[in-house]
From Swiss-Prot:
GO terms for cellular component: mitochondrial [4Fe-4S] assembly complex; mitochondrial matrix; mitochondrion. PANTHER family: IRON-SULFUR CLUSTER SCAFFOLD PROTEIN NFU-RELATED, NFU1 IRON-SULFUR CLUSTER SCAFFOLD HOMOLOG, MITOCHONDRIAL. It comes from Schizosaccharomyces pombe (strain 972 / ATCC 24843). GO terms for molecular function: 4 iron, 4 sulfur cluster binding; iron ion binding. Belongs to the NifU family. One of its GO terms (biological process) is iron-sulfur cluster assembly. Disulfide bonds: none annotated. InterPro entries: FSCA_dom_sf (IPR034904), Nfu/NifU_N (IPR014824), Nfu/NifU_N_sf (IPR036498), NFU1-like (IPR035433), NIF_FeS_clus_asmbl_NifU_C (IPR001075). This is NifU-like protein C1709.19c. Residues 161-231 are annotated as: NifU.
Length: 260
């Protein structure tokens, strides 16, 4: 996994002292992507490998989500999936999770399946869905990528953390088919809580990226930051546990078949 690119971030604290930030409403509109397919007669989808061998990034050459939503993720077994496209992709054996970025889709698979069999099906489902003008989301997720919008109630340190994530860290993470979500800052311990999403969530090098990449950059520009930790939502922990049980059953059945 690539580390976030280091870009000039001079006079950060001075800039925030002079800058005024307006409060941001959490309200949003349900996304119905009519605009994205009005002029499309044929869609050309390309795929890119990610640092996570179990995740592929698919780029259809059009915006999947509007800026008001940013990104959203669905995992097998999480319950309600407010995405017709994600529901279709989950019908493919082996699909573990679906991540929608602004203009890309990251599909993650279980360790016991092969892309050679899955990839053509994924291409077909995405192509058919987008070509028909079907909505990507049936309603807006409860949590979007508005985590780095600077609020009037944010402290100067939190505002700087959000700005650095949005301008320097997030673009590099998205290149790898994932995203990073700001979950909070504990001023007493200097701990930044982040959630890795998409291809980065299950990548074997995610811990290295978190500590040697993101943490190093935040500590360099913001001395108040002492540590960066990854967090999971309760429903995500349950979904991961259930999928691991499912994979264990599949692998167990394969071993029994091989021993016969």
């Amino acid at each position: 996994m690539l580390f976030p690119r280091v870009v000039p971030f001079q006079s950060l604290r001075t800039a925030f002292q002079k800058k005024t930030f307006l409060p941001v409403s959490s309200a949003g509109n349900v996304f119905t992507p009519r605009f994205q397919l009005q002029a499309i007669r044929s869609i050309w989808i390309r795929s890119e490998e990610t640092p996570n061998e179990n995740a592929l990034k698919f780029l259809p050459g059009l915006d999947i989500l509007p800026p008001t939503i940013g990104s959203c993720e669905f995992m097998r077994g999480q319950g309600t999936v407010n995405s017709p496209l994600a529901q279709k992709l989950f019908d493919i054996d082996g699909v573990d999770s679906i991540f929608f970025g602004k203009d890309f889709i990251t599909v993650s698979k279980g360790a016991g399946t092969e892309w050679a069999q899955m990839k053509p099906e994924v291409f077909s489902v995405i192509m058919e869905h987008l070509s028909n003008g079907s909505p990507v989301l049936s309603e807006e997720p409860l949590k979007g990528a508005s985590d780095t919008q600077i609020l009037e109630s944010d402290s100067q340190i939190v505002a700087m953390i959000k700005e650095l994530i949005e301008t320097s860290i997030r673009p590099s993470i998205q290149e790898d088919g994932g995203d990073v979500e700001f979950r909070g800052f504990d001023e007493k311990t200097g701990t930044v809580s982040l959630k890795l999403r998409g291809a980065c969530r299950t990548c074997s090098s995610s811990a290295v990226t978190l500590k040697n990449g993101i943490q190093q950059m935040l500590k360099h520009y913001i001395p108040e930051v002492e540590n960066v930790v990854q967090v999971l939502d309760p429903e995500e922990e349950v979904a991961i546990a259930e999928f691991e049980k499912f994979e264990q059953r599949i692998n167990g059945n394969k071993q029994k078949a091989d021993n016969k």
